Amino acid sequence: MVKQKRKGLERTAKESKKQKITPAEETPRASEARPGKEAASPVVQEASPELSPEERRVLERKLKKERKKEEKKRLREAGIATAQTAKVQTPPAKPSAAVLALEYLQGWAEKQESWRFQKTRQTWLLLHMYDEDKVPEQHFSTLLDYLEGLRGSARELTVQKAETLMQELDGTDPKARSLGKMQRLRQVLQLLS
C-alpha cells in the first residue's frame, strides 16, 4: 500500500510539472522581450510558487540559454564578432629571438643589475654568431667580450664548431667563401684557443 501511495504521488507531481511549464508558444521569445534577466523573470515568477527551487533553477537556465542563442544569432546577422572571438584574434606581438638575444648581450655589456644568465639567449647567440645579418658588426665585438668569459662545455663546443666550420670553408671554392664569416671564425678561434 505504501508503494501505491508513492506511485500516486509521483504521477501527480509529474502531471503538475507538465502543467506548470508553459508551452513554448505561450512563453515570450527573448528577441521580442526586453534583453537581460527581466525577459525570463515573469515566466519564472508566474510558475515560482508552484515550482521547487531546483525546477525554477533549471527553467531559468533554459531561458538564459535561449536568450544567449538569440543574441548570438542577432549579432551574427549584424556581422559583429563576439567579444570572445575578438580576444582570440589579436594576440600580443612577441619580440623575436634575435631581438631578445641582442638585448641580453647589451644588458651584459652594460652590467645592468637586472641582467642574469639565460641559457636560451646564450645558445641563440652561439648558434648565430657567424651570421652577419643576425648579429650585426656593432654587436659582434661585445659578443667576443662575452665569449671570453665562456666556461665549461659551452666553451669546448664553441671551439669544436668553429674548427669544423673553418675546415668546411677551407674545402669549399674560394669564390664561394664569405669573408665576413671567415674573419669571425678566426677571431673566435684566436680568442678561445
UniProtKB/Swiss-Prot annotation:
Gene: Chlsn
Coarse class of the protein's main subcellular location: secreted
GO cellular component, one term: extracellular space
Residue stretches spanning the membrane: none
Species of provenance: Rattus norvegicus (Rat)
InterPro entries in UniProt: WKF
Keywords: Phosphoprotein, Secreted
Signal peptide: none
Subcellular localization, as worded in the UniProt entry: Secreted
Function: Hormone secreted from the intestine in response to cholesterol, where it acts to inhibit cholesterol synthesis in the liver and VLDL secretion,leading to a reduction in circulating cholesterol levels. Acts through binding to its receptor, GPR146.
Biased composition (Basic and acidic residues): 7-18, 26-37, 53-77
GO biological process, one term: negative regulation of cholesterol biosynthetic process
GO function terms (MF aspect): hormone activity
Chain positions found as Phosphoserine: 41, 48, 52, 96
Annotated protein name in UniProt: Cholesin
Region (Disordered): 1-77
